[in-house]
Amino acid sequence: MSGHPGPFPSVSSVLPHRPPFLFIDRVVELSEDRVVAVRTFQADESFFLGHFPERPVVPGVVLIEGLAQAMAYHSLLHHPSRQILLVGIDQARFRSTIGPGTEVTFEVHVGEQRFGLTKGRGEVRSLTQPIASATLLGYAAEPHGNPSIPGGTR
């Protein structure tokens, strides 16, 4: 992997997600410990119909999922035969709202990786304005069956 701008493999060739639940358009930077992805939220996104019709706002859960998908992209390049599961979200903060037509970056600094678990600290930005941030925990599970997550309560 390179610390320089791409081109990188397409998002759809790495992630199993598909529209309408794919929230990153492309990866623009990638290194051993960092990934930056971009998404432009279009006016016809289905969630804008109900969130909120008079003043459409991208739901916070969509922003967190975008961070998780960026981290999953990074993890799947290291573990291509695994299924990456989001198993934890900590310190989620929402600083501003965004609406249709907004381009955001999802930047995740990938940290500690042990026992199939990956911890990442992510930030969503529009231009230079911080929108949201969170610490994420992902797990590289076997692709079939019911995963047992280390430290989980299943």
Where are these regions (language model features)?
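Single-stranded RNA-binding regions, centering on S1/OB-family and related RNA-binding modules
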Residues: 1-9
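HotDog/MaoC-like acyl-thioester-processing domains
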Residues: 2-3, 32-36, 98-102, 109-154
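Hydrophobic beta-strand-centered segment that forms part of the acyl-chain substrate-binding groove
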Residues: 3, 70-105, 131, 139-141
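Short aromatic-glycine motifs in intrinsically disordered, low-complexity regions
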Residues: 8-18, 80
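Catalytic strand-loop segment that frames the active site of acyl-thioester-processing enzymes
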Residues: 18-58
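Hydrophobic core residues within well-ordered beta-strands of beta-rich domains
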Residues: 21-23, 104, 118
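Compact, glycine-rich, soluble single-domain proteins
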Residues: 49-73, 86
